Amino acid sequence: MLRILHIVTYMGRGGLETMIMNYYRNIDRTKIQFDFLVHRQEKADYDDEILSLGGHIYHMPMLNPFSKAYFNALDDFFDNHKYDIVHSHLDCMSAYPLKIAQKHGVKVRIAHSHSKSQDKNLKYPIKLLSKHLIPKYATHLFSCGKEAGDWMFGGNAYTVLNNAIDAEKYRYDCQIRNQVRDELKISKSDFVIGHVGRFNPPKNHPFLIDVFKSVHDKNRNSKLLLVGTGNGQSNIREKVDNLGLSNSVFFLGNRGDVNSCLLYTSPSPRD
C-alpha cells in the first residue's frame, strides 16, 4: 500500500483541510492511505474521521525554523516512519519539513501553495526567505491556482491542482433550503448571503460587514451567515452591533453543511 504523509498545521475545518478530506474520502483506500503530521496538540475537527478512514495523526511541536528541538523532532519522526510521498501544505514554511524528508530519503516531496500572499507581520521576512528555499528541497510544486503558484514559486515550474468538490452536494435542493431557513428562523423570502472563513485578518471580515451594511440599507430583508471561528470574532460581533445589524447577521460557528447555502461571498484578497 502507498502511504502519503500530509504535513499541515492541524486538521480543522478550513479550506485546505477540507480539500484534503474531499480527496481522502474518494480515493481507493485499499491502495492508498493518508497520514497526517500536525503542528498543534489539541484535537481537531477532522481527527475522528481520519482515524475512521484508516489514517494516522502524528503531533509535532509548533513549527519554528530557529528551534533545534523542532528539527530533532522531525528527525526522530522520519527515523521511525517511512513514506513514499510527503506532501506539505505549510505554504512558505514547507521548506523545513521537506528538507528533513529529503535527508531521510523520501523520494517524492511536494510543496503545495494555497494562498497568493502572506500577512505582512513580524514573520513576513522569514517567510519570504523560506519560500525561496522550497525548490531546493521539493521534487514537485503544486498550487491551487496561477496567482498562488506565481507568488510562492516565482519562475519555477509548478502544477496547478484545482481544488475539487463534490458538485452533486451543491445542487439546488428546495427541501434543504427550507430546512436550514426554518432552523435559523429566516423567512423564505429573505435574501441570504453566506461566508465561510476563520475570523482572522486575511479573511477580511470588516470589509464584508461594511459591504453587507450597504446591502442591508437597500434590502432590510437581507441576512448574512458567517460560518467559522477565530480570535477576531469578538471584534466583528462588536462591529455588527455598532452598525445595528445584530438581528441580520448570524454567527454559526463551525458547520459541516456549508453546501446548504446558495450564495457565497469571499472578500479575502488572498483567496
Residue ranges, per PLM feature:
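Conserved small/polar residues in nucleotide/adenosyl-binding loops
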Residues: 264-271
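Active-site donor-binding acidic/aromatic loop of nucleotide-activated sugar
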Residues: 232, 246-256, 261
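A conserved, positively charged/aromatic
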Residues: 110-143, 152-153
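A short helix/loop element that forms part of the nucleotide-sugar donor recognition site in Leloir-type
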Residues: 171-186
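A conserved mid-protein helix/loop that constitutes part of the nucleotide-sugar donor-binding site
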Residues: 14-22, 191-214, 231-237
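Short His-centered aromatic/hydrophobic patch
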Residues: 88-94
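N-terminal strand-loop element at the rim of the active site
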Residues: 2, 6-69, 230-233
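Carbohydrate-associated surface elements
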Residues: 147, 164
